[in-house]
Amino acid sequence: MAPVKKLVVKGGKKKKQVLKFTLDCTHPVEDGIMDAANFEQFLQERIKVNGKAGNLGGGVVTIERSKSKITVTSEVPFSKRYLKYLTKKYLKKNNLRDWLRVVANSKESYELRYFQINQDEEEEEDED
C-alpha cells in the first residue's frame, strides 16, 4: 500500500464566519398579541446546536432582544430557514399562525406581518 499523504493547507487559520439574523416582531408586540420575551425564551429552549436543544452550544449561538427585535448570532453554520421554522412553530403553539406570517424583508432578517385580507371582496359579498 502506498503511504497516505496529508494535505497541508497554507495560510493558517480559517476566518470565523459569524452569522447574524434578526426577527422583527414590532407589529404583534405593539398590538399586545405576542410577548417578545416569551418568544426569546422559546428560541433559547428550542434551538439545537450539535443535535442538542437548550444549551446553545456553550455560547456558540447567542440570542439578544431589544424591545421587539430578536437577534440570533451564530459562530457555527446556522440556517435562516431553521429560524423561520422555529418561528412558525412558536406561532402555531400560541394560536397566532392564523393571523401572522413570517416574511423575509432582507437577506438576513425576517419580519412578522399580518395576513392581508381584502376588505373589498367581503363588502361585495355582503351587497349581493
From Swiss-Prot:
One GO cellular component term noted in the UniProt record for this chain: cytosol
Subcellular location, principal: cytoplasm
Protein role: Component of the large ribosomal subunit. The ribosome is a large ribonucleoprotein complex responsible for the synthesis of proteins in the cell.
Molecular-function GO terms, alphabetical: heparin binding; identical protein binding; RNA binding; structural constituent of ribosome
Family: Belongs to the eukaryotic ribosomal protein eL22 family.
Miscellaneous comment as given in the Swiss-Prot or TrEMBL entry: Binds to Epstein-Barr virus small RNAs and to heparin.
Record's protein name: Large ribosomal subunit protein eL22
Record bears the keyword DNA-binding: no
Keywords: Cytoplasm, Heparin-binding, Phosphoprotein, Ribonucleoprotein, Ribosomal protein, RNA-binding
Residues with Phosphoserine modification: S66
Subunit structure: Component of the large ribosomal subunit.
GO biological process: alpha-beta T cell differentiation; cytoplasmic translation; translation; translation at presynapse
Subcellular location: Cytoplasm
Annotated source species: Homo sapiens (Human)
